[in-house]
């Protein structure tokens, strides 16, 4: 019974597997030196077909030649590596040559920054414009005539035991400041009792007050001193309390 099953085993496989793929078929003469086929020995074709079902020849023979119906192709590891290397070089060479020709990463001279591209200069121009505007403004301010008013707050003649103090004030309206300062000096002298209502004493005080303001202030402010003194004199003459 086992012999019958073994002989009929090849009928379970397709007929196209009868072709030998791994090695050429051995003729009957080379299978047995005496030329006699033993009935109990399975045929070589059957064993080869059985091995093809359970063994992956591609794993053991990765570069085995396979016969195709139309044409035959032979591949070798050396040829594969050389072809892949040449294709890799052909793909990389144009990119490298193009990058080198464009001189993208090469600089002829050092710049003000480490950036690849030149940075715009709107901020520097803005700073220079602001600096120019500030310079023009300061020049205009210097050209504008600002008067340095020296105001005497007290004198030894008007208040006994005091000292003369000079105060430097930059005023946009020198005439008003001189008039107010002179009025304060006259009021302080009257309140302190240093200034009497004697007309002669009044003239002497006003004369000394005018000369003091003219001597303590620069020449370009004398016109404001005289105008302020004239206003004070007119106001004193119009008041009920006259010192002249």
Swiss-Prot record:
Expressed in roots, rosette and cauline leaves, shoots, stems, flower buds and siliques. PROSITE patterns: OVATE (PS51754). Signal peptide: none annotated. Residues 166-235 form the OVATE domain. It holds the Pfam family Ovate. Keywords: Nucleus, Repressor, Transcription, Transcription regulation. Its main location: nucleus. It is found in: Nucleus. Residues 63-91, 111-131 are annotated as: Disordered. It comes from the Eukaryota. Residues 69-87 have a biased composition (Low complexity). GO terms for cellular component: nucleus. One of its GO terms (biological process) is negative regulation of DNA-templated transcription. Disruption phenotype: No visible phenotype under normal growth conditions. NCBIfam families: A_thal_3678. Plants over-expressing OFP16 show small rosette size, late flowering, reduced fertilization and blunt-end siliques. Transcriptional repressor that regulates multiple aspects of plant growth and development through the regulation of BEL1-LIKE (BLH) and KNOX TALE (KNAT) homeodomain transcription factors. This is Transcription repressor OFP16. It comes from Arabidopsis thaliana (Mouse-ear cress). The lineage of its organism: Eukaryota, Viridiplantae, Streptophyta, Embryophyta, Tracheophyta.
